[in-house]
Amino acid sequence: MRKIMLIASAMSALSLPFSANAIEFDENSLECGPYAKVGIVGGVLSGVESARLDPADSEGKKHLPLIKGMPFGVTLAAGMTITPGVRAEISAMYLMNVKAEVELGKMGSDANTGTTADASAGVIRKHKKLTPPQPNIMPISIADRDIAVDIPNAAGQGNVDVRAAARIAWLKNYAGIDYYVPDSNNPQGRVVNPVLLNIPQGNPNPAGGGGRAAPAAFDILDHAQWRDVVVGITALSNANKPNVSAVKILSDKISQIYADIKPFANVASVQISETPLPDSASVDQIQNKVQELNKVLEDVRESFDGFILNAFAQPVRLNFQIPQVVQGQGQQPQAAATAQEAAAAAAIRALNDGENNGIIQLYKDLYKLQRNVALKKSMKQLGDELGVDQGQEGGCSKDKKQSDTTAEESKKEGKKGKEIEFDLHMAVGQVKLYADLFTIDSFSVYAGIGAGLAYTHGKIDGKDIKAHTGMVGSLALGVAANVADGVYMDVDAGYLYSFSKIEEKYQMNAFVASAGIRYNF
């Protein structure tokens, strides 16, 4: 029997009621005391999926398949055997090759695993339509209200559309209200939007009492009615303020546009900056971001101009101007914040005017191009299939040769279609607790549980990301073997679970296995 001697002097110093007699454990029990461990670790990613949608999915819900890498790395730990068979440790693990490739060339059900007829039937699919960002109605400032009240009518004897064009445009851009709407009684006609009659106009409690009756009709050329409508719209817009800042709304809007056009920009070698506007963006940063967006959209349009008829002809011109109230703001923090919000709101309104600034037409043209390219590819595949059928008269050898050629081309296409979606590194620190389940000779089977933090950095879509820190938990089941006096070999397998997502896209869970040497001091 092995004895661990408890020194009498130490016990006396601690005033503990123990004698100097030895405490005896079974020969195969693990010794109490501190230990250190070093080892290697490897695993397989689990639960993570591509953030890219499969363009072949008409519902726009299916994600492209991922080819996941096998993470590997090293682990270091320091711990304490608390009682025989129970130990606690602090461990650090560094994982490399946390990566995955997306199969751009393989569209799920497009795989040629069926008959020729099946392959031909699945060639033409309905593509998800590109949809421009929806307009955002922003609160109207007092300065914008005062400017709008004084919008004049155009001189002359023209119709309302011409004389009140500036006022009609203000209603659309600032309030999202169309001045004219289709006439329900006459499909070919149009009437003044009845919503304009429901907007509070003027003082609801004028002197003398009795209230104020709503007008029977709205005349946009009438300056008094126009002033009252502008004041009413301003009050309503500020009563329904969004919960997020104008800068955040603008940043999200630009990010959505960039995400929509990115495939086309990549083909045209147009660089897209995926850095969002910070919440504290200055007026100059907002102006530069809008100018950058205008340049990117115009570069994409020019790149495809002439590829198909009657498309990409309307230039993209974002009519963004810094509001006059912003230009006169001081440098005080409160004034700077007001200027920031006003500039962001003006930029949002410039993007809202998609009919005139060219954004809506660009989306239509890109969708037309997408369908045109898909149709050409489908026709080529269909022609290849028809060529196979016609070649059957020439004998089996010709069919086999053509089939081999098609298979070889498919392999090449598949290789070209792979792109690294993310390539990350993870540093994981955990506090773990292990307990032996049972012991046989010099072997013991143990289970463990752990919790801690994971620090992740690297690249997503080829761009460096901001380092992410999140909570993780783990479970493990393993075997420990006593290979020498005080030296043990641990081999275990388990599951690492992440409680948060990186970039709000990827949840890095993994099945992991490790092997290490543990030395008891």
Swiss-Prot record:
Compositional bias (Basic and acidic residues): 396-415
Membrane topology field: Multi-pass membrane protein
Tagged with keyword Membrane: yes
Membrane-spanning intervals of the chain: 64-86, 469-484
A Pfam family assignment: TSA
Keyword line: Cell membrane, Membrane, Signal, Transmembrane, Transmembrane helix, Virulence
Signal peptide: 1-22
Protein localization: Cell membrane
GO terms for cellular component: plasma membrane
Source domain of life: Bacteria
InterPro entries: OMP/PagP_b-brl (IPR011250), TSA (IPR004933)
Keyword Cell membrane: yes
Region (Disordered) residue spans: 386-415
Role of this protein: May be an adherent factor for rickettsial adsorption to the host-cell surface and a determinant of virulence of individual rickettsial strain. It is the major outer membrane protein.
Name assigned to this protein: 56 kDa type-specific antigen
